[in-house]
């Protein structure tokens, strides 16, 4: 499954894995998964977290290692982002629910994920997605960026 991923995708997923793997031991625990999900405004129960881990925990050790994570991501990509998942993701970023993601909102979410970005990096991310040049990202622009990944 993971062998169908490009090198770019693999390195992108490695970066995402590192965001989850807070202590850097090469495994994602339910605690680490919960921390990241809560920072994104989700509120999973312990049982839900355990289910998510069990779903991809091939060796049954109760954690997700990088190869297991890659398989999960490859599976998720095959399901391709449903409209509902994209709307949900957009809502996570659009803190004030005004239909736009501002630089401040983007910075806030990225900081919660443990990504320390400079103002330049945040502005660059906005510029890349901001088709109509209004300095923020609307839903259509967000979908374009997410589908291009």
Curated annotation (Swiss-Prot):
Ca(2+) 1 binds at residues 21, 23, 25, 27, 32. Transmembrane segments: none annotated. The keyword DNA-binding does not apply. It is found in: Cell membrane; Nucleus. It is a peripheral membrane protein. InterPro entries: CALM/Myosin/TropC-like, EF-hand-dom_pair, EF_Hand_1_Ca_BS, EF_hand_dom. Coiled coil: none annotated. One of its GO terms (molecular function) is calcium ion binding. SMART domains: EFh. Ca(2+) 3 binds at residues 94, 96, 98, 105. Its main location: membrane. Disruption phenotype: Compromised nonhost resistance (NHR) to the nonadapted fungal pathogens Phakopsora pachyrhizi and Blumeria graminis f.sp. hordei. CDD domains: EFh (cd00051). This protein has four functional calcium-binding sites. This is Calmodulin-7. The gene is CAM7.
